[in-house]
Design a protein with these regions (language model features):
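A polyanion-binding, active-site-adjacent surface
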Residues: 1-150
Length: 150
């Protein structure tokens, strides 16, 4: 079993925070285990919660269009979220919920070792880049711990 498959199983069994009580399905990352690019969002939405896969709803359709427009195949990237379970009513995840999932996202990044991490949204940006201002760095490549974030 690949290490990322093991992480996915741990995500599905996780009970580190109260989101395990309200989720339909936990949503582990999915994609190419040797990806040069990782996309990291905030948390699963309604469709993701139903299907147990990241970015299959409206945001996923938009991401698919962007990938297609840039000539990137979705099968060549890895897609995940900071928080692996849907917060009720799609609210912003709490710090406790983010911290409960930190090991998962850190392990995913460590194992894949991508060339660039595309950070989507304030929650992902704040978690991965220690709360640095997203507006100040929007559209720029930021380096941290030898990794490139966009």
């Amino acid at each position: 079993m690949h290490k990322l498959d093991s992480i996915a199983e741990n995500v599905k069994e996780c009970q580190k925070c109260e989101l395990c009580e309200t989720r339909t399905k936990a949503v582990p990352g999915k994609g190419n285990f040797d990806a040069d690019v990782i996309f990291v969002g905030e948390a699963p939405g309604k469709n993701e919660d139903i299907h147990g896969e990241p970015f299959v709803g409206a945001a996923g359709k938009r991401l698919d269009m962007i990938l297609e427009d840039t000539g990137i195949d979705r099968q060549d990237v890895y897609i995940t979220n900071i928080v692996k379970c849907r917060p009720p009513k799609n609210r912003v995840p709490s710090k406790k919920e983010e911290e409960s999932c930190n090991d998962f996202i850190n392990q995913e990044i460590e194992i894949i070792n991508p060339k660039i991490i595309c950070v989507m949204g304030n929650t992902a940006y704040g978690t991965l880049l220690d709360g640095k201002e997203i507006t100040k760095n929007h559209g720029k490549i930021v380096e941290k711990d030898g990794r490139k974030f966009f």
